């Protein structure tokens, strides 16, 4: 019997190293993060050296720009707020085995919905107007992702494909709206009308871009963590993601869990879009997402869909981006190089986090074409 | 059975002081094993006792950390399987290594094809496999497609393959797991014939009845060490079990139960399904299970038993027929509703369906309690203190050996994993329990424990449907037994009025009697 019962760990499920709570794992993860950062640092030194600058002082200037004083910290965080929400959203879907790579599209849908609610409703009491904008965004994202989740649950339409393709449909449709019927006639480029003032978060630290939305973001991250890791709902979602056959045989509503987790994921991504509109941009324009949805997917993968790890990685990512902007200012190291650097670091992190194994699992899923 | 071989000079094969560790785990420690020419030597032990590791060391798949291997008195070192093949060692794996779409000749010669320049010389191959085939009494056209043959014949092809490669030492890993009792007997005749012709056979098994039927000597491993080696004639099953488990009180006979059989709890009428994965479709299956009763479902794997279990719990839809539980029709209901109405289920594939293999013990135990919690309470904490205390209490009560409720299920042994499943299912206090292969890959001590819990459940009035490929299990536990063949109930009998041989006949579909439910 001995050979037959040794099934490989997690033949199904995307994030197979889940449910780990043993001691020693935290240190492994820290070591892994440390490795990644060292690789990144070495790469940075090399790239800056190649441009003929003194690497360490240049880097120090970048780090100074990112986290050197309270103002810069606030600025760095403010830039990252939508990413925190979107990354938590993506992680929640991953945890229940739904590979929601449609985050970018859901962010656009949410941004559009909140921009419209902000521009065409009101002015009214600020709190109510903001709530309306955020709810509209959540509804748009949730509806979009939920529909794709339903397709997967009911018809076996693979969500990897459907969410990926939905990005193009949604982003291009929003671009059509912003350049066509809903275009702000007073502007040249493709934007919608500016939201009224009651649909904007007030800055809490002057000239940092850090607004009151930070409280909402903290609350949403806490909610996402609770939902996914602590609640009964999260238990069902995680079981559905890790061991779908077990969940099915145990009487857990697998289809319902898949749809519900996609709804939650889409709602959070939609809210990330609303954060972009109501806390910084003030309107929808055709490039508003600037790849935050893709960043969210990457960060959630590196964080292996654990909410806390994902949030930590979002923070690291934000600091890196800000530092790269800082480096760009003090040297002629172009921003393209900082993007290369970030990509390399992500690859190193991904290698450590077993992301490639996860991609192999996806490929396997496609080759077998067995929609469960 | 033949006379024990204790004389002879130098053994054909001698493993001495074999030690193999995997990280902190010692799989083999100072293991000694030898094999005489013309001998059938059984290697027995529980799961994880180190049988497979030892054989993989012998077959060159693992390198031992310490110890020596002698073949014909010559010390050898096997770095890969081809090394050991060169010394005449052949392995018949539990899972056949045959290409179903290849012909018999292609499969047998695969990896050592006659002919030159990469071309397959059909004639030479047909010629070359003739001799080993006739040694086994296999009479098949060499161009038969392997996939069309039945399991027992495929197994013979596997053995032919080993003989074709010139093996003098044949390792058989759990060869009877896939066979009916009759096919098992045939295999034993064949093995005896091979041994009489001078081949030596290492027979790995945990089924004692078979070991005693075929082996000349028995070596018992426990926890990676050799516990005993004795001639079959000089020992008995009780001693061997004691050596395997380290306990003297393991029951091997019929499980004692005091349960009064009462009203019908589960009634299946004419249920049919579509074909599902590798299993046969159900075709009008009808039966009842009464309160306090254990009904066994016997049959060669792939005759619809797995589908039956899944159709009853609700993961496979019916195409016809009805299922009643306690007088209530549950045909159209989902798994959750069926479970709420008192149905419990121990699935066949423990790692996929029984437990969340990468989840924690507590997550595996609590599925029944968390499944049905509704509405706003689902937003609450899944594992508050009370739940964790409940989990710890279950771990205690079902003596699940684990560092704690938050240990990963995958780190537990098969027996302890199965205890998680049984604990969860029995804690729901079911009126009907479906057991699918409940003791597969479970060690003898844990089997004893699980049977005890099942007997207690029937004493409380639980109706049990026991689906098992292990006839001994069915004969030890059940009151009635149904035999499935090609998706139908081929026979039904009271356990006290039937025999292993009779059931075996029905399992092969030899004689289809009138079905009565």
List each model region and its residues.
Chain B
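Glycine-rich phosphate-binding loops of nucleotide-dependent enzymes
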Residues: 2-517
